[in-house]
């Protein structure tokens, strides 16, 4: 036995331990689920490593978890014969949180126990959940393939530090002993532990065993002798891979508990799909849509993907090759009969079997979402609130499924008068006016800016619906989604409005006449504004506002410019087209001005007003204020 060393917990571990004890007190029994789940993972890892090194089994290939309790001592012990840990592994895994985005996780905590418990659950507490019920935790572990005298003893009271020393342990694997708090001694009861195992761990694919006491010899009802039986370790769970069982035999509760096992989420899944595929490729998949987005969904370093099994043997976590990035929220597993047991991430990358499975699984998930949207609109809105912005990445990433993804998108609309994104493109098409051939939309900084944009005035007057987009990703989305079901998506802030048959002959004639009559005014404004605009035109889209700016058909939009600037990207100079409304009193009075200097000032003021309305900011706000003050002063004389 080596000299004992004391190590301090990583700061984040101290925070997590404190938060757990104070936030998860209402669901204490999850400690057993977490520790059994970890033990099962250790067995999976050993099985995988033993594929290339059978000696790691050390003559004991029957993998299992054993749980025992000592009422007198007030202890619970969870023991496995899985892969075990080395000394360095113990210090790394039981003293730190090696997760990217950990600091961000702690920032998101609110201090409200119910909310924080959900967030902590998403983060995944694993081993540290032991301290919810234990005043001290003792871990004895030996890594597979290491000598008996290279085992490690780890111990901590969950305060600020832990001790580590080298010990001798005859068998490989990990043994965790919880020294229960005085008010948690209920967990040192065999029947209590059995009920928790049945509730949370029935789906674990290796036996979770508890000691079954033997019985002495006794007399039977007819005076015959019933022989004594010896005690033995009895499996408390079904110990078969849940995904290999018949769907009709699996309860919703079992599916939900399995979801929590593989995802380490504390909340139920929103929906799931369990399928066996036969044909050119043979595989089983069990896919879950979570009910809540993980706290680190937008973290670029976050690992995602399905658990991969080959012929029931665990191969790897986070096999991202089977799921496109825009579906990275999907949890679950895939079990293939066709891939080799020695498959690596590199082999998966360019494998035709992988690509075929990815295509099939992607279609399966999209089908799940389509069915949910059709059968339960309220539940689909719950999904959209959590994952809608991620799904919007789809049209750019997955050309083959672009139309299906587009059908799943939801937007706010002038039809509903609400900021809630509840309108699908199919809803929009079903309400299109007779003769309407385009789907009209606007992208702005906020819902209010979109809903109140002057670009909508004529369309509102005609009762034509406009989709209102205000998320950062919407401009990116719309650049890759130009049509849906042969209907072109058309921005009301770009190029010509193009109402087509929605504009009758009389309106067209009136518009042409107005443009002709206003030609001298337009030329004067062009001269006044010079190089600050690409063009000046009579508007066809305004009814109540004097002027607006419009992006040219081939030019970069205002929102895309903002996105690129925010990302520190160089942005080309884009000059707007300035549209004026000659019917507005301000513009008609402007036309009457004979003083060309005053005319130029008023023209510039109208332009900057329009730019402020469109962009929400100006390149030189102080110049705008100076000009406005100058104009106010001149008119207050």
Curated annotation (Swiss-Prot):
PROSITE patterns given for it?
Answer: HSP90
Q: Which segments carry the region annotation B? A: 346-562
Chain intervals for the UniProt region annotation (A): 1-345
| GO biological process, alphabetically ordered | DNA damage response; protein folding; response to heat
Q: Molecular function (GO) terms listed? A: ATP binding; ATP hydrolysis activity; ATP-dependent protein folding chaperone; unfolded protein binding
User: What does this gene product do?
Assistant: Molecular chaperone. Has ATPase activity.
This protein is called Chaperone protein HtpG
Recorded source organism is Shewanella oneidensis (strain ATCC 700550 / JCM 31522 / CIP 106686 / LMG 19005 / NCIMB 14063 / MR-1)
């Amino acid at each position: 036995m080596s000299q004992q060393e004391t190590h301090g917990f990583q700061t984040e571990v101290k925070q997590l331990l404190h938060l757990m004890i104070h936030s998860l007190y209402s669901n204490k029994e999850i400690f057993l689920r977490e520790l059994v789940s970890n033990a099962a993972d250790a067995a999976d890892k050993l099985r995988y490593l033993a594929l290339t090194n059978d000696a790691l089994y050390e003559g004991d290939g029957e993998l299992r978890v054993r749980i025992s309790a000592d009422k007198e001592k007030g202890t619970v012990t969870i023991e496995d014969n899985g892969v075990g840990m080395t000394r360095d592994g113990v210090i790394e895994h039981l003293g730190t949180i090696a997760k990217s985005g950990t600091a961000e996780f702690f920032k998101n905590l609110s201090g409200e126990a119910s909310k924080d418990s959900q967030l902590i659950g998403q983060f995944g507490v694993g081993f540290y959940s032991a301290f919810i019920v234990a005043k001290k935790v003792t871990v004895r572990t030996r890594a597979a393939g290491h000598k008996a005298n290279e085992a490690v003893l780890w111990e901590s009271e969950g305060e600020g530090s832990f001790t580590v020393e080298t010990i001798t342990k005859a068998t490989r694997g990990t043994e965790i002993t919880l020294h229960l708090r005085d008010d948690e001694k209920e967990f040192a009861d065999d029947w209590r532990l059995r009920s928790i195992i049945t509730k949370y761990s029935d789906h674990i694919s290796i036996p979770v065993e508890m000691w079954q006491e033997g019985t002495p010899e006794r007399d039977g009802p007819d005076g015959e002798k019933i022989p004594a039986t010896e005690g033995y370790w009895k499996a408390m769970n079904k110990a078969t891979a849940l995904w290999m069982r018949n769907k009709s035999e699996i309860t919703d509760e079992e599916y939900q508990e399995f979801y929590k096992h593989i995802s380490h989420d504390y909340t139920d899944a929103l929906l799931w799909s369990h399928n066996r595929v036969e044909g050119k490729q043979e595989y089983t998949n069990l896919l879950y849509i979570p009910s809540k987005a993980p706290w680190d969904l937008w973290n670029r370093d976050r690992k995602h993907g399905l658990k991969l099994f080959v012929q029931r043997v665990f191969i790897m976590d986070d096999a991202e090759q089977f799921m496109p990035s825009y579906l990275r929220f999907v949890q679950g597993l895939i079990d293939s009969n066709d891939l080799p047991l020695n498959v690596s991430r590199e082999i998966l990358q360019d494998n035709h079997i992988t690509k075929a499975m990815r295509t099939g699984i992607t279609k399966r998930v999209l089908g799940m979402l389509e069915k949910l949207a059709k059968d339960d609109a309220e539940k689909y809105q719950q999904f959209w609130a959590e994952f809608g912005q991620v799904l919007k990445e789809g049209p750019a990433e997955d050309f083959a499924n672009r139309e299906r993804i587009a059908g799943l998108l939801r937007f706010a609309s002038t039809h509903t008068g609400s900021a809630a994104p509840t309108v699908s493109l199919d809803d929009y098409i079903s309400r299109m006016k007779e003769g309407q051939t385009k789907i009209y939309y606007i992208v702005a900084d906020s819902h209010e800016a979109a809903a109140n944009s002057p670009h909508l005035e004529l369309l509102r007057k005609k009762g034509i619906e406009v989709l209102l987009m205000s998320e950062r990703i919407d401009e990116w989305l719309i650049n890759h989604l130009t049509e849906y079901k042969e209907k072109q998506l058309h921005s009301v802030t770009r190029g010509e409005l193009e109402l087509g048959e929605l504009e009758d002959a009389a309106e067209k004639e009136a518009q042409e006449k107005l443009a002709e009559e206003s030609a001298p005014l337009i030329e004067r404004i062009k001269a006044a504004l010079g190089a600050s605009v690409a063009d000046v035109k009579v508007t066809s889209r305004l009814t109540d506002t004097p002027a607006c700016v419009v992006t040219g058909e081939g030019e970069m939009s205002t929102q895309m410019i903002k996105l690129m600037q925010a990302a520190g990207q160089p942005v080309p100079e884009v000059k707007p087209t300035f549209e004026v409304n000659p019917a507005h009193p301000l513009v008609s009075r402007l036309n009457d001005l004979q003083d060309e200097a005053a005319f130029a000032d008023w023209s510039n003021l109208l332009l900057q007003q329009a730019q402020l309305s469109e962009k929400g900011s100006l390149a030189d706000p102080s110049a705008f204020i100076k000009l406005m003050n100058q104009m106010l002063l001149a008119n207050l004389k």
